[in-house]
UniProtKB/Swiss-Prot annotation:
This is Protein CPn_1058/CP_0792/CPj1058/CpB1100. GO terms for molecular function: peptidyl-prolyl cis-trans isomerase activity. It comes from Chlamydia pneumoniae (Chlamydophila pneumoniae). The keyword Signal applies. It comes from the Bacteria. Belongs to the chlamydial CPn_1058/CT_355/TC_0634 family. Residues 1-27 form the signal peptide. Keywords: Signal.
Length: 363
């Protein structure tokens, strides 16, 4: 999967509000303690322009790798520029985007760090050439806007993309092998039978409602009986011939458009009338007196829903089941990594609810 597709997959937010400072420069090194959540609120640097800079430790993966607020900011920078390059000069747009996306991106960055650590243990790496190609595909060869507006160095950009690609690679390897074992031909056939059963419960009704009018109710009833007899005998709908018949008897024919509806779309009154018709032996049931004349329900077709043959549907079903299983396996893999490295979701929830706003606050 291309990285830019992953970036596009994150929900985009409309622009607005006040710009919150985003500075790419690293501060002096923050001492790492044994706890992944200590030093959570230490501020290391301040932008001369008056915007707060927060290179705080958010999570400690191991002795060599920690997730800082700056890692999240760098990811937000690239996501924003990839989605809205034309708004790179808009402080309000960046403010709205960063504030709204911070919770989502924080968790994704932590998961990426965990997967990169797992990839390292499994000796899985991404070719630097592939990383550079991805950067060029996403942003072109001119990266000066990223340097100028986000103060990100080439190495900063490389690290974000390398981490994302490596996480995608190890995730793909872990997920695909397990999912392929679960999406078996038997599972595909079972899902196809389920679709067949669902389709068979859908009945499609195609019908018209005819109204016969005349000077008297008695005459309208007689003409309606003749129209019903003609339709049930001919088994075809010929509006011109029926109109001529009604006019010759001193009446007027009004016909509705042709309806094509499923059971769930039918009104109760129409459903009751259509059920009384002995289709396909007859097209019309008995005429019903109405204030506007006599009504006839003419059933042109009644079919059960169906789906394409298995050999046509197999590929689509396989893709659908693969996606469902992949989502489940991916969650299980992430949960195992979080448990292994001591990820505490409650601490992250606290960070998001209580401490995230100061990370992007104005002085």
């Amino acid at each position: 999967m291309k990285l830019y597709q992953t970036l596009r997959g994150i929900v985009l937010v409309s622009t607005g509000c006040i710009f919150l400072g985003m500075h790419g420069g690293y501060a002096a090194e923050v001492p790492v303690t044994s706890s992944g959540y200590e030093n959570l609120l230490e501020s290391k640097e301040q932008d001369p322009s008056g915007l707060a800079i927060h290179d705080r430790i958010l999570f400690k993966v191991d002795e060599e790798n920690v997730v800082t607020a700056l890692d999240v900011i760098h990811k937000l920078n690239l996501l924003f520029y990839n989605s809205y390059p034309h708004l790179i000069d808009s402080f309000p747009a960046r403010s709205q985007y960063y504030t709204a996306m911070w919770p989502v991106v924080l968790e994704s960055v932590i998961d990426e760090f965990l997967m990169v650590a797992d990839a390292k243990a499994k000796r899985i790496a991404t070719d630097p050439t592939a990383v550079n190609q991805e950067i060029e595909e996403m942003f072109g060869r001119d990266l000066s806007p990223l340097y100028a507006h986000f103060e990100m160095s080439p190495n900063d950009i490389f690290n974000v993309i390398d981490r994302t690609l490596t996480a995608q690679r190890v995730m793909g390897m872990m997920v695909r092998s397990k999912v392929m074992l679960k999406v078996t031909p038997g599972k595909i056939r079972e899902y196809y039978r389920k679709l067949e059963e669902e389709a068979s419960r859908k009945v499609i009704w195609k019908y018209r409602v005819l109204t016969i009018k005349a000077n008297t109710e008695s005459l309208a009833s007689q003409i309606a009986d003749k129209v019903r007899a003609r339709l049930n005998e001919a088994k075809t709908w010929d509006k011109d011939r029926l109109t001529a018949l009604v006019i010759s008897q001193g009446g007027q024919l009004v016909c509705s458009e042709e309806f094509s509806r499923e059971n769930s779309e039918l009104s109760q009154s129409h459903k009751q009338e259509l059920d009384l018709i002995g289709y396909p032996k007859e097209l019309c049931g008995l005429p019903k007196a109405h204030k506007s004349g006599y009504k006839l329900y003419m059933l042109l077709d009644k079919t059960s829903g169906s789906i394409e043959p298995l050999d046509v549907m197999e590929s689509k079903i396989k893709q659908h089941l693969f996606a469902l299983e992949a989502e489940s396996v991916e969650k299980q893999y992430k949960d195992r990594l979080r448990k292994r490295y001591g990820y505490d979701a409650s601490m992250i929830a606290k960070l998001l609810s209580e401490e995230a706003p100061p990370l992007f606050s104005l002085l």
